[in-house]
């Protein structure tokens, strides 16, 4: 099986604080892994570096055969293949859950509204909140918001999912 994510000696500092120290990791296609650790141990920093939302200072990160660095030219194309659910769910409060899930597929993937809504409803059903599709984020519990954020990421049909 081929590698979809590869990290070699990845280091990241915030001023004098080293958030990531010599991280080495290989993830194969279709493989599911869990990175666990206490608060402040660098888990979120690591996934933000994989998606180039944070810059790593040393080492190599390769995602689906593309090295991720300041020289990466088509980072948006790579990001379109990497779904991400943030600690703060970042749902748009003024949009329904359904609209939160259809926005990126319509704008980025150029799907029709009908196509995007069908995919969104499939994914909302997958995370068991399809009955909440017309509600707004503030009307859902924290757990439901997390599932809505996961469904939203799945609507882009990513090769890789980080959360």
PLM segments and residue spans:
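ABC family nucleotide-binding domain
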Residues: 3-163
């Amino acid at each position: 099986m081929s590698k979809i994510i590869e990290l070699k000696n990845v280091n990241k500092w915030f001023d004098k604080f080293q958030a990531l120290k010599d991280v080495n990791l290989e993830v194969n296609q279709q493989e599911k892994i869990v990175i666990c650790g206490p608060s402040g141990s660098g888990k979120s920093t690591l996934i933000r570096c994989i998606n180039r939302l944070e810059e790593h200072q040393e080492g190599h990160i390769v995602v689906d055969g593309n090295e991720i660095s300041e020289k990466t030219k088509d980072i948006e194309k790579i990001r379109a293949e990497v779904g991400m659910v943030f600690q703060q769910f970042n749902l748009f409060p003024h949009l329904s859950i359904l609209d939160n899930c259809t926005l990126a597929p319509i704008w980025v993937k150029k799907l029709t509204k009908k196509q995007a809504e069908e995919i969104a409803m499939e994914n909302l059903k997958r995370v068991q909140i399809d009955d909440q599709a017309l509600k707004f984020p503030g009307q859902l519990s924290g757990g439901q918001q997390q599932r809505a954020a996961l469904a939203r990421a799945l609507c882009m049909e990513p090769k890789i999912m980080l959360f």
